């Protein structure tokens, strides 16, 4: 009995490690795509904001969600449109960015308060959080590396196979969040060099 219990915890640990590595690789690739195609990324984020707005209106009309929760969500989407005006250069000290961060916290508070009082299945609660609260801030977070002046940038050679694959052989500046991912990659999986 105890042996199977230990095996289950060991397998859970291995599965979490693989999932974490897969998510990190996916984020790295997404950040590369966003840096390469900033205009398309801006358009996609704009469509995501419109979709989130339509979902909020649908929740108000069909599901009778509270007016305050929907109103704050719609105002948050309006602030996100303001962030798109300077995309991909998002200033972390701009009033729009600070206001959007504060509104994310307020939206979460209102959502937790509402779902604590009203019963909805977990899948429906998760759908609300995904489409109305998480997807747009996540898109802006991943795209922070698209602007050259957003995060500190450094020069890195990127001579390994993975970097050459992602950059298609381009040499040059590695910017933003990609520097963080590259640092983490080197810290966790350092490259081996033959010493003669």
Curated annotation (Swiss-Prot):
One of its GO terms (molecular function) is COPII receptor activity. The chain crosses the membrane at residues 3-23, 42-62, 70-90, 97-117, 125-145. Detected in testis. It is found in: Membrane. GO terms for cellular component: cytoplasm; membrane. GO terms for biological process: endoplasmic reticulum to Golgi vesicle-mediated transport; positive regulation of apoptotic process. Keywords: Membrane, Transmembrane, Transmembrane helix. It is a multi-pass membrane protein. Belongs to the SVP26 family. PANTHER family: PROTEIN TEX261, TEX261 PROTEIN. This is Protein TEX261. The lineage of its organism: Eukaryota, Metazoa, Chordata, Craniata, Vertebrata. The gene is Tex261.
């Amino acid at each position: 009995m105890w042996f199977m219990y230990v095996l289950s915890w060991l397998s859970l640990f291995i599965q979490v490690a693989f999932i974490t590595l897969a998510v990190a690789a996916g984020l790295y690739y997404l950040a590369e795509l966003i840096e390469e195609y900033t205009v398309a990324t801006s358009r996609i984020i704009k469509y995501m904001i419109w979709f989130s707005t339509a979902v909020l209106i649908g929740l108000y009309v069909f599901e009778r969600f509270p007016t305050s929760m929907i109103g704050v969500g719609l105002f948050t989407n309006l602030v996100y449109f303001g962030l798109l005006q300077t995309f991909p250069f998002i200033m972390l000290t701009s009033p729009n960015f600070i206001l959007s961060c504060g509104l994310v916290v307020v939206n979460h508070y209102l959502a937790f308060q509402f779902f604590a009082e009203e019963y909805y299945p977990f899948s429906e609660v998760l759908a609300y959080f995904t489409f109305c609260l998480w997807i747009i801030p996540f898109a802006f977070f991943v795209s922070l590396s698209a602007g050259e002046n957003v995060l500190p940038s450094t020069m890195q050679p990127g001579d390994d196979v993975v970097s050459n694959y992602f950059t298609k052989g381009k040499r040059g500046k590695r910017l933003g969040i990609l520097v963080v991912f590259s640092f983490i990659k080197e810290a966790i999986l350092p490259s081996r060099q033959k010493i003669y």
